[in-house]
Amino acid sequence: MDPNSTVSGDGQATAAIEHRSFARIGFLGNPSDVYFGRTISLTIGNFWASVKLEPSEHLVIKPHPFHDLVQFTSLDHLLNRLQNEGYYGGVRLLMAICKVFRNYCKENDIQLHQANFSLSYDTNIPRQTGLSGSSAIVSAALNCLLDFYNVRHLIKVQVRPNIVLSAEKELGIVAGLQDRVAQVYGGLVHMDFSKEHMDKLGHGIYTPMDISLLPPLHLIYAENPSDSGKVHSMVRQRWLDGDEFIISSMKEVGSLAEEGRTALLNKDHSKLVELMNLNFDIRRRMFGDECLGAMNIEMVEVARRVGAASKFTGSGGAVVVFCPEGPSQVKLLEEECRKAGFTLQPVKIAPSCLNDSDIQTL
């Protein structure tokens, strides 16, 4: 339970509960998570979303003063805002997870007390950067609900990513389980989404790994993303239609996570360079440059120009980089990013966020 919360004798939280969920990087294997593949992902302490739950008389979902803005200085202000930020803030995400959580508890005979609460959120995860900002808000909110209703021990860790994904699907967000697994577990996680496991268990096999196995990583992203890939991808439909090239390519991408796990355990950094670069190259062959977007491709190329390994963190918007030659190579990368107008940050790895109650459900 959140250390800031207290619980009454009947199991109801009587003080504020607050949880953070961190941005995630798909390290190897993405996007095979939605194609019965395997991935390795990690959460990073650079960016996070936080959700605060406070007991209240009525159930209240509080809009964020910036992300859910409804007051503008002019029509042009509104127009610019919508062009840069879109129509959606976090209120809909909080509403969706409340609905999905309640339905899950009903379907699984989990009794909930009748007290009400107010939910508010904040986030510093950059928009449109492929760092899982939406699912971070949802997973942080789920943690608050688990503690408020004192049901953490009744909902297995393995199924929580499904609950988070279900909330996002309510809103038409198309995604896979990888990001939600990373944010529910925290730290570095190997994930096996093979069809056998998904059909039998309803979820994958998730194996936490020691974060100290990772080499120093960097993150490249654009402060004002544009041209992030506007063309609708036909990869999913081609896979469903049995396209041999897409099917074999997705299998190859998934196998990179297996090879990557071995390379991490053996501290084989030259192999990691090879695997990271190959991951992006296969994605590029499948999706095509028009779909990926010129700016996204340039972020990868900037890193490669100095001999670093690079790939998307997600589906575009940011790139994870490994400089095997160390600080001197990072210096070269800093200069290339500055010239290209990109932001470069060293990755701070966020450790596992599971507590004793969570671990007992595994």
UniProtKB/Swiss-Prot annotation:
Question: What cofactors does the UniProt entry give for this protein?
Answer: Mg(2+); Mn(2+); Co(2+)
Q: How is this protein's function tied to pH?
A: Optimum pH is 7.5.
What does the note accompanying the cofactor annotation read?
Magnesium. Can also use other divalent cations like manganese or cobalt.
| EC numbers for this chain | 2.7.1.43
Q: Which residues bind ATP?
A: 126-136
Alphabetically list the UniProt keywords.
ATP-binding, Carbohydrate metabolism, Cobalt, Kinase, Magnesium, Manganese, Metal-binding, Nucleotide-binding, Transferase
The reaction(s) annotated as catalysed by this protein in its Swiss-Prot or TrEMBL entry are: D-glucuronate + ATP = 1-phospho-alpha-D-glucuronate + ADP + H(+)
Active site, renumbered = 179 (proton acceptor)
Dependence of activity on temperature: Optimum temperature is 35 degrees Celsius.
Per the UniProt entry, what are the Gene Ontology biological process annotations, in alphabetical order? Answer: cell wall biogenesis; inositol metabolic process; pollen tube development
| EC class | transferase
Q: Where is this site: Transition state stabilizer?
A: 24
Could you tell me one molecular function GO term of this UniProt entry? Answer: poly(U) RNA binding
Xref: Pfam families: GHMP_kinases_C (PF08544), GHMP_kinases_N (PF00288)
Expression tissues: Highly expressed in pollen. Detected in seedlings, inflorescences, seeds, leaves and roots.
Family assignment?
Belongs to the GHMP kinase family.
- Function, please? Sugar-1-kinase with a strict substrate specificity for D-glucuronic acid and ATP. Involved in the biosynthesis of UDP-glucuronic acid (UDP-GlcA), providing nucleotide sugars for cell-wall polymers. May be also involved in a salvage pathway for glucuronic acid.
Name of this protein = Glucuronokinase 1
